[in-house]
Structures are given as structure tokens and as C-alpha cells.
From Swiss-Prot:
Pfam families given in the database record: YbaB_DNA_bd
Lineage of producing organism: Bacteria, Pseudomonadati, Myxococcota, Myxococcia, Myxococcales
Organism for this UniProt entry: Anaeromyxobacter sp. (strain Fw109-5)
NCBIfam families: DNA_YbaB_EbfC
Family the entry assigns: Belongs to the YbaB/EbfC family.
Function of the protein: Binds to DNA and alters its conformation. May be involved in regulation of gene expression, nucleoid organization and DNA protection.
Localization per Swiss-Prot or TrEMBL: Cytoplasm, Nucleoid
MF terms (GO), sorted A to Z: DNA binding
Keyword DNA-binding (UniProt): yes
Self-association and partners: Homodimer.
GO CC terms in record: bacterial nucleoid; cytosol
InterPro entries xrefs: YbaB-like_sf, YbaB/EbfC
Protein name: Nucleoid-associated protein Anae109_3761
HAMAP family referenced in this protein's UniProt entry, alphabetically: DNA_YbaB_EbfC
Amino acid sequence: MDIQYLMRQAKKLEKAMADAKEQLAELSVEAESGGGLVKVTMNGKCEVTRLLVDPKAVDPADKAMLEDLVTAAVNAAVEKARAAADEHMARATGGIKIPGVAG
């Protein structure tokens, strides 16, 4: 087994992973709740980039409902962003599962 070859391959994998992590900020997913009353857009780093709330969802007498809708939309977006990030990183690593790499 050629150690130099393994080291070169490890460097290539490291570079591919670093590039893929940078590209996660460019991924975009959208999730909604309440039949579209609340929409969240998130990047592959699980950062919220946009939050839209339909005026129909804003009822001062029912603040808890809006909070629940926002929570549900954010959680759905996180799930989608993690799945997209996992898929993106799997392509970058050739399908090699590396714990803690994605999302």
C-alpha cells in the first residue's frame, strides 16, 4: 500500500469537503406551515435567510398560533436543509459517511 497515494487522496477529500461546505451557503430550501401562512427560506448551513408571514396569520388575540406556525415552518426548513446538506456532502465525499461533516 502506497502511503503517499493515501496522503494525496486524503488531501483531495479534505479539499472537496471544504469546497462543499462553502457551497452549503448557496443551497436554498423553503418550508411552510399553516397552509402557506408562514414560509421560511433557509440555506444549507441552517441559517434562516427569509421569513414571510401572511397578514392573515397575525391575530393579536392568538399570538400562540403564530408562534406555533413559525416554529413548525422553521423546524420543517431545518429538516429540509439538513437533508440537502447531507446529500451535497455525500456527493462531495463520494458517498463516504464521515460523522459530523454535514449539516
